[in-house]
Amino acid sequence: MRIEASPLYLDTSALAKIYVQEADSDALDAALTGRRDILISELALTELTSALARRVRESQITAAAARRIYQQLLRDVRAGEYRLLDLTPATHREAERLLLTIGRQAPLRAADSLHLALAALADVRALITYDRHLHAAALALGSFEVLPISLDPAA
C-alpha cells in the first residue's frame, strides 16, 4: 500500500495493526514508516486498550503483553509518532450531524461517527480504517481518500 495523501488519520482498527500482528500489519507498517503526519485520537487509545483487554480475556495475549503494547503506544504518542486529537464539543456536534446524514445511507455507529468527525474537522486527506462500516461511511462522506481499498469481509 502506498499512501500519498497527507495528513492521514488512523482509526482504532488501523492503529491496532501497528501494535498487534494481524493481517496487513506488515504492509501498513511499511506504508507508514518515516511519516510524521499521522493523526490519531484519544478515542482510539481507549478503544485499543479495550481491544487489548478483550484479547487477554479471550486468551489471545497475556496480560503482560497487553501492558507492554499499551506502554509502547503511550511512549510513541509522547515521542511524537502521532498527533493526538481530542474529543471536543465541536467533534460531538459534527459526529451527531454525520449520524443524521451519512448514518441514513451507511451503517454508522456512534464511535465511528466520532472518528469520522475527528478526521473531517482535522482536514485530513486520507483516513485509514479496516472497519467495513466506517469504511463505507467515510466513502459516503466523500471528503477524503479512504484506505485500504480491500477489507476483510469478516471485519
Positions of PLM-derived features:
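Acidic, PIN/NYN-like endoribonuclease modules and their adjacent C-terminal/linker elements
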Residues: 1-7, 101, 120-155
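Metal-dependent nucleic-acid phosphoesterase active-site entry motif
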Residues: 1-25
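PIN/NYN-family metal-dependent endoribonuclease catalytic core
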Residues: 9-10, 26-87
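Alpha-helix capping/helix-boundary segments
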Residues: 14-15, 44, 91, 115, ...
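Alpha-helical elements of the RecA-like P-loop NTPase motor core of helicases
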Residues: 26, 93, 135-136
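Acidic catalytic patch
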Residues: 78-103
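Conserved SAM-binding loop
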Residues: 84, 108, 127-128
